[in-house]
A protein has these predicted regions:
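Extracellular/periplasmic periplasmic-binding protein-like sensory domains
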Residues: 270-356, 423-426, 430-435
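Secretory targeting signatures
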Residues: 1-49, 436
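Short, polar/charged alpha-helical segment
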Residues: 68-91, 212-217
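Immediate post-signal peptide segment of exported/extracytoplasmic ligand-binding proteins
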Residues: 45-57, 89-97, 189-195
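Beta-alpha junction/loop-to-helix N-cap segments that form part of ligand/metal-binding clefts
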Residues: 67-74, 89-164, 173, 231-238, ...
Length: 436
């Protein structure tokens, strides 16, 4: 027979010792939970706040460019709001908000140099945005190199700003002036290649370069240019020029300059070139602003104009991924909605979008460079190829934008339609212009 097993003897663990083991186990679990919670806390501890990054600029809130300037300011403020409400910028382990420091330049180039000196030397802005318009951007650009500050251009598109003078620290987010009227000429070539063209444009560098580039392109396609004239930027009466363009036998009119003179041209067409009016009209800048249609009513119908951006042109993270590009910032709909929230329900036109994109591109470069150093941020701006709500961003060695695409818009029955290119159009171009 076998001897009794150990189990039949005295228990190895008494009830009292069992309670001690359970208590120790519970305490150990509590310690593990506490240690784990502490680890999670430190791993997710909010980054320390580093302060604000001051971005300085002048903007035209009064004077000739007040419509474009005001909308540009609103676009910049919209993107600043988005950045700050989405965690700010992380540089070297610290979080920074964006603060804006700006002055009204009154649309006068002569005001710009001293204001930028003040922004840099007295207000201590670390980075700069350029003013609205090519003349004012030209006046501001020297400060960027003189004081070694990165400056992003959102409203100065004349190629001459970069091609006539080397600009070390000036970078553009918008397509250059030489491409503005190309879409209009392309449409005419495809649909009315025998039309005769008249050009009437403002004597500033942007308007001149944009229109002359279009005329050269049109002539290379076989068009006849029967009238080519410019006018002072402060012109109050263009009836003589419009009458001369009509008498030259022109079918179409291209040119203009900015918002104020765009309205002037359209209002004076009613009495100078109305029997019949031009068959096709494409004007710079003015046409894209909602106020253009509000002030002109039916006279705006069928007028076309180039645009850097419209709300119906939807860039997205999905599109960026398909193109092999990184995506940054709000979607077009998010930008549009936030802009409306901050501005009484207003819808942004391209001046707001390009100005907002300028701040966003600057923010991306600062964060990717992980530095406030001008050389580091400028180098990042030169190497980036990204997509945001405004479209693609990439520059050449001079700082000129080479990746962004433009569209052609036309007012139709009180609505602004994108008519070119076909891939993003929400309407087809209407011809001829009737004046009503």
């Amino acid at each position: 027979m076998s001897e009794p097993s150990q189990a039949q003897g005295t228990p190895l663990v008494t009830p009292r010792s069992r309670r001690k083991v359970i208590a120790i186990g519970i305490a150990f679990v509590v310690i593990l939970v506490a240690v784990g919670a502490t680890a999670v806390y430190y791993l997710t501890l909010p980054k320390p706040f580093g302060g604000s990054i001051k971005v300085g600029f002048t903007i035209s809130l009064t004077g000739q460019y007040n419509i474009e300037g005001t909308n540009s300011r609103r676009g910049i403020e919209t993107v600043a709001n988005w950045i700050n409400s989405h965690g700010g910028l992380t540089i070297q382990g610290k979080v920074y908000n964006v603060s804006l420091d700006y002055y009204d330049d009154q649309s006068l180039p002569g005001n710009v140099p001293n204001l930028y000196t003040r922004i840099i030397q007295q207000d201590n802005a670390t980075f700069l945005l350029a003013p609205y318009s090519s003349p004012l951007t030209t006046a501001a650009a020297p400060a960027a190199d003189q004081y070694d500050r990165v400056m992003i251009s959102h409203g100065g598109s004349s190629d001459l700003i970069w091609t006539q003078t080397s600009r070390r620290n000036l970078v553009a987010v918008l397509s250059p002036a030489s491409l503005y009227l190309k879409g209009a000429v392309d449409w005419l070539k495809a649909n009315h290649p025998t039309d005769k063209i008249a050009a009437l444009y403002a004597q500033d560098s942007f308007s001149t370069f944009a229109t002359q580039s279009a005329l050269g392109y049109a002539q290379s396609l076989g068009f006849s240019v029967v009238y080519n004239a410019s006018y002072p930027t402060n012109a109050q009466d263009l009836s003589t020029q419009l009458t001369a363009a009509k008498n030259a036998g022109a079918d179409d009119l291209i040119g203009g300059g900015h918002y104020t003179d765009g309205l002037l041209i359209m209002n004076q067409l009613k009495t100078t070139w109305n029997t019949p009016p031009p068959k096709f009209i494409s004007l710079l800048v003015a046409v894209t602003e909602p106020a253009f249609q509000t002030q002109l009513g039916g006279t705006a119908n069928n007028v076309t104009g180039p645009s850097q951006w419209e709300t119906v042109v939807t860039y997205s993270p999905t599109l960026a991924q398909a193109a092999g590009l990184p995506w940054y910032g709000p979607s077009p709909s998010e930008f549009t909605q936030l802009y409306g929230t901050l501005n009484g329900g207003a819808t942004p036109a391209y001046h707001a979008a390009e100005a907002g994109a300028a701040l966003l591109v600057l923010a991306i470069a600062i964060e990717q460079a992980n530095s406030f150093n001008t050389t580091a941020v400028r180098a990042k701006l030169g190497s980036m190829h990204v997509m945001n709500f405004f479209g693609e961003y990439q520059i050449d060695s001079r700082g000129l934008q080479i990746a962004h695409s433009m569209v052609l818009v036309q007012w139709q029955a009180g609505l602004k339609k994108v008519v070119l290119p076909p891939s993003v159009a929400d309407g087809s171009c209407q011809y001829p212009y009737s004046g009503t």
